[in-house]
């Protein structure tokens, strides 16, 4: 009598079930990883605009050349997943002129978890850094788990 070679149907079904379970666990984790990577672009662009704000403040405004509105290419940077814009809050507030950066994600070409989401950052000039805060009525509505650890909301 010849010995059978190969796998039985039950063994193959068990392997397929295990692969399915692993895929069900890995897919959401991968989607979160993609969203976090896309959010990092916002902070990269904001870091470049932070330097512009510091230079622009020497002219007494948040925008380049002391203008009243953001100029494309100077105060507005378009990335692969969205657009970062310098904001200026009313200089007549008790705190004086407040500068910030507003990042808005594109409606296409980004993770489903980021469509229509925004990030608002205030330039803390004394500390020389950006902080997650409402600026000129613009807020952050990206889920906390996608933000870098230094910017997580309490």
From Swiss-Prot:
Positions of post-translational N-methylphenylalanine modification: 7
Transmembrane segment boundaries: 7-29
Superkingdom of source: Bacteria
Keyword Transmembrane helix tagged: yes
Membrane topology classification: Single-pass membrane protein
Keywords assigned by UniProt, alphabetized: Fimbrium, Membrane, Methylation, Transmembrane, Transmembrane helix
Intrachain disulfide bonds: none
InterPro entries in UniProt: N_methyl_site, Pilin, Pilin-like, T4P/T2SS_Core
Propeptide: 1-6
Major subcellular site: other
Gene3D superfamilies reported for this sequence: Glycoprotein, Type 4 Pilin
A GO CC term assigned to this protein in UniProt: type IV pilus
Pfam families associated with the record: N_methyl (PF07963), Pilin (PF00114)
GO biological process, alphabetically ordered: cell adhesion; type IV pilus-dependent motility
Subcellular location, record wording: Fimbrium; Membrane
The keyword Acyltransferase is annotated on this UniProt entry: no
Binding partners and assembly: The pili are polar flexible filaments of about 5.4 nanometers diameter and 2.5 micrometers average length; they consist of only a single polypeptide chain arranged in a helical configuration of five subunits per turn in the assembled pilus.
Family: Belongs to the N-Me-Phe pilin family.
Protein name: Fimbrial protein
Organism the protein comes from: Moraxella nonliquefaciens
Gene name linked to the record: tfpA
